[in-house]
Amino acid sequence: MNTMITFLVLFVLTAANGAPEANERKIPEAIHNEDQSLAEMAEELMFFLQQTEFEAPLLQEEEEAEXAEXRNSRERRCAMGDVPCTKGKTNCCKGYECKPKSPAWWYDTDFCQSIHSGRPIGI
């Protein structure tokens, strides 16, 4: 344990005091290279921003067209069996039609009923 602590202290002292002249020479070159790379990155960023400003309205128009297609192609909600409906405005699903439930007077509205017996075709 004492050996490890000794080597650790020696390493810290060497790193702190070792060859400061070599590090001082490299710093200005690194700063100069960073300045050049930052300038190049700034130019590339400006070019990219100009491209995106040009393409943004085109992409927005495409998204609006896709949203309009999806909105128009969406299937409307429909009513299945034994759901009240009106004769003039049918909201019954495919395979159902708006018919009176029975000839009884207490059913004042019509209901969606299956055209065929069993499960309707197409659903």
Swiss-Prot record:
GO terms for molecular function: ion channel regulator activity; toxin activity. Its main location: secreted. Disulfide bonds join C78-C93, C85-C98, C92-C112. It is found in: Secreted. One of its GO terms (cellular component) is extracellular region. Residues 19-77 form a propeptide. Expressed by the venom gland. Keywords: Cleavage on pair of basic residues, Disulfide bond, Ion channel impairing toxin, Knottin, Secreted, Signal, Toxin. It comes from the Eukaryota. Residues 1-18 form the signal peptide. Belongs to the neurotoxin 14 (magi-1) family. 05 (ICK-7) subfamily. ICK-7 sub-subfamily. The presence of a 'disulfide through disulfide knot' structurally defines this protein as a knottin. Ion channel inhibitor. This is U9-barytoxin-Tl1a. The lineage of its organism: Eukaryota, Metazoa, Ecdysozoa, Arthropoda, Chelicerata.
